[in-house]
């Protein structure tokens, strides 16, 4: 019995040794197999190299729907605008946040290089998130400097120096283009045609009346004049006496069911040129009739004519309709077309503008017309004292045609026109003008409109409350939906809000990581560019796309920095590794954007530490991007003149938490600030002495770049959804399962052998020990 127990012990020990050896072997000899299995699982879960990839839908945009990608804003509110305009420092407060859910959609997708590259077009959209701590962007308003106006002056200053004027004075001059367009629109309107009819109609009526009177025979019980007045006012058919063709459009009741009922005495008063209320009186009567037509039956002029002429409202209206639509359309129009040498009445206004023929060589400003905005002559011959030698048709085709880029009714065309003078080329063949005519036009635009009458100055300054240097707008207008009235008036198609919604970009190409995991989700081309051409030197498009996916499987060789291509400022930015971190129970690595991410760099036009100069990207708008509250910017360009900034690292830091196995960014908070510049020489180069801004503070340091005013703070962050975190944990669990799967038979079998051997050994030992003790104990007792 003892021998059997010893055999059991020996066998158990042998089995346990074998089992332990197998278990150790399973862990020591198969790590390469495990890593391959794990890597393949991660690659399958991360790499998007075909439409069938596991994460294709997430990459295409579903990820932005399922997770909360938040873009949030704080607007800077200028609390003392009037003091600032009088030379005081600015006091700012931040208003917000205004939270938006940010989503993207990738479309027109194609793969190339055997799935190593993916080409796509991306669109982005932002939707305001009501609730949380978000303010309502549609009801909250703030006051600040207007980027549209600053951009306008900044752009104009490049040319105004050559012309020897300030940017604002050049603005007044160029505003002559839309001002002239406004003149011509009025002169080409039905209202002006009616004025021309009222002015010229009496002459041609008298001619027609004399012709007709000569054909009326004298076999009447009354005089031909009385007969004409009776027929003119009440005949509903062509009279039998007189030439029938000459009666055409000479009868106010013609074709009506019943006569007008106007008395003979009233008819005599209406058509008596000596009566100051007469339709044919060119001294006072013309003003009464024009104002009555323009201002309607309730106007004072209408009522005066009714009373003085002894007719009622219906009768007066009937006379007006006949005069404008009957007589003048037939007789006066043809004469005006002939005099102006034009084929269409639509060019009558241009004829008046360059010749003054339609109003008998008089300006429209000379007529006593209620609510007429032109108090001084606006026509070129009267304003300049000389006529142009070109015809009306030539002027319309070459100078005032809205459909051509060089039209003098646009600030672009007028700018080109003035440039010919500033460069002394005097080449105006583009407009088919002689030098004399060109000098007349330049004198008109440079001197007469801006400075003599103030038309263009007043027109520009009329927009200053809503479109000037400092304006008040809702948050929604500042961010997305700004309508700048001054830009619209000038015909400038330029966005005046800081952001764009539902934008569709040019195609981009990204590495999928199929051939090189380190390139996963890095740009090859950003919007068709592999090298950016907007900067002063070569800037290659490099870095990860801003959608949160970095290179996977970096846990064993953790990168000390991550380079992201920042789409808003068009340059690569590097974040440096800081420490370990954790997001919702998942181990991550924390990275930060360094403080000096925008150093002085001539390639990027950066002249001040902490400011990214984006003026060239935004059509001359002097935009400078910084960290929040201008953190890292020297005080002489920030807190020295700006009150309300919170320049602390904790406020401005930009963190990113990377899960290094999958390469997923589980948390980040990108924070940038938009600032606007007013240069130190703005008072001498930008602002006109005729304007409102010359008292604004300007640093006395001649080397200063001016003052930079904060506009808005932009933040973008993302928090993975609970579902995504749970899915990530499940993937880790699956990866762990994949990891042990190849050795499960060996390890489990080895473990069983180990356990069985230990059990057998223990049992054998126990039995041997029991028998030995039993034997010894018996001897003792005994």
Swiss-Prot record:
- Transmembrane stretches in the record are 8-28, 740-760
Topological category with respect to the lipid bilayer? Multi-pass membrane protein
- Record-level GO BP terms: phagocytosis, engulfment
Q: Name one GO molecular function term.
A: scavenger receptor activity
On whether RNA-binding is a keyword of this UniProt record, the answer is no
Q: Which Pfam families match?
A: CD36
- What does this chain do? May act as a lysosomal receptor. May be involved role in macropinocytosis and fluid phase exocytosis.
| Designated name of the protein | Lysosome membrane protein 2-C
Species this chain originates from: Dictyostelium discoideum (Social amoeba)
Q: Which gene specifies this protein's sequence?
A: lmpC
């Amino acid at each position: 019995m003892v021998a059997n127990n010893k055999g059991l012990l020996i066998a158990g020990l042998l089995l346990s040794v074998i089992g332990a050896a197998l278990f150790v072997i399973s862990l020591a000899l198969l790590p390469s197999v495990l890593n391959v299995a794990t890597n393949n699982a991660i690659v399958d879960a991360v790499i998007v190299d075909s439409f069938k990839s596991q994460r294709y839908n997430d990459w295409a945009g579903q990820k932005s729907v399922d997770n909360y990608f938040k873009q949030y804003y704080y607007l800077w509110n200028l609390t003392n605008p009037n003091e600032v305009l009088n030379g005081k420092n600015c006091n700012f407060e931040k208003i917000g946040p205004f939270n938006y859910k940010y989503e993207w959609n990738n479309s027109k997708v194609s793969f190339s290089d055997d799935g190593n590259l993916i080409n796509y077009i991306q669109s982005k959209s932002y939707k305001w998130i009501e609730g949380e701590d978000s303010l309502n962007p549609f009801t909250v308003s703030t006051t600040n400097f207007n980027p549209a106006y600053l951009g306008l002056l900044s752009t104009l200053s490049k040319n105004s120096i050559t012309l020897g004027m300030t940017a604002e004075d050049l603005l007044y001059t160029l505003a002559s283009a839309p001002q002239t367009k406004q003149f011509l629109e009025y002169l080409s309107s039905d209202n002006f045609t009616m004025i021309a009819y009222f002015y010229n109609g009496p002459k041609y009526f008298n001619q027609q009346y004399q012709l007709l009177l000569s054909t009326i025979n004298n076999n009447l019980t009354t005089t031909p004049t009385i007969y004409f007045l009776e027929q003119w006012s009440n005949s509903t058919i062509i009279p039998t006496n007189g030439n029938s063709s000459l009666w055409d459009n000479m009868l106010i009741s013609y074709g009506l069911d019943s006569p007008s009922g106007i008395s003979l005495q009233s008819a005599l008063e209406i058509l008596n040129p000596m009566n100051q209320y007469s339709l044919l009186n060119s001294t006072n009567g013309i003003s009464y009739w024009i104002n009555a037509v323009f201002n309607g039956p309730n106007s004072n002029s209408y009522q005066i004519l009714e009373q003085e002429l002894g007719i009622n409202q219906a009768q007066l209206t009937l006379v007006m309709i006949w005069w404008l639509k009957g007589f003048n359309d037939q007789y006066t129009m043809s004469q005006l077309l002939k005099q102006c040498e034009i084929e269409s009445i639509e060019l009558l206004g241009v004829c008046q503008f360059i010749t003054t023929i339609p109003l008998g060589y008089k300006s429209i400003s000379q007529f006593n017309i209620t609510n007429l905005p032109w108090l001084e002559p606006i026509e070129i011959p009267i304003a300049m004292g000389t006529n142009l030698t070109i015809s009306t048709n030539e002027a319309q085709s070459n100078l005032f045609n809205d459909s051509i880029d060089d039209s003098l009714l646009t600030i672009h065309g007028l700018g080109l026109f003035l440039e010919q003078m500033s460069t002394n080329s005097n080449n105006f063949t583009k407009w088919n003008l002689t030098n004399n005519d060109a000098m007349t036009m330049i004198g008109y635009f440079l001197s007469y409109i801006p400075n003599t009458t103030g038309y263009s100055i007043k027109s520009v300054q009329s927009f200053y409350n809503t479109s000037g240097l400092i304006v008040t707008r809702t948050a929604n207008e500042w961010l997305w939906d700004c309508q700048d009235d001054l830009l619209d008036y000038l015909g400038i198609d330029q966005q005046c809000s800081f952001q764009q919604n539902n934008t569709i970009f040019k195609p981009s190409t990204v590495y999928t990581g199929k051939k090189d995991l380190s390139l996963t989700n890095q740009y090859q081309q950003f919007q068709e560019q592999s090298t950016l051409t907007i900067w002063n030197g070569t800037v290659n498009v490099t870095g990860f796309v801003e959608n949160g996916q970095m290179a996977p499987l970096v846990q064993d060789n953790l990168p000390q920095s991550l380079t992201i291509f920042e789409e808003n400022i068009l340059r690569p930015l590097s974040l440096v590794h800081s420490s370990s971190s954790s997001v919702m129970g998942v181990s991550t690595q924390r990275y930060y954007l360094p403080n000096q991410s925008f150093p002085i760099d001539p390639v990027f036009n950066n002249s001040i530490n902490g400011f990214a100069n984006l003026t060239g990207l935004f059509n001359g708008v002097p935009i400078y991007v910084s960290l929040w509250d201008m953190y890292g910017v020297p005080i002489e360009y920030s807190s020295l003149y700006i009150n309300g900034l919170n320049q602390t690292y904790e406020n401005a830091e930009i963190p990113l938490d990377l899960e290094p196995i999958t390469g997923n960014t589980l948390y980040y908070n990108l924070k940038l600030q938009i600032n606007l510049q007013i240069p130190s020489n703005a008072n001498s180069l930008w602002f006109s002495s005729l304007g409102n801004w010359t008292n604004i503070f300007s640093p006395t340091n001649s080397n200063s770049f001016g003052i930079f005013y904060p506009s808005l703070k932009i933040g973008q962050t993302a928090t993975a959804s609970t579902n995504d975190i749970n899915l990530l944990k499940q993937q880790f669990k699956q990866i762990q399962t994949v990891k042990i799967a190849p050795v499960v038979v060996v390890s489990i079998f080895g473990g069983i052998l180990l356990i069985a051997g230990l059990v057998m050994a223990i049992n054998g030992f126990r039995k041997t020990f029991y028998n030995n003790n039993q034997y010894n104990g018996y001897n003792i007792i005994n």
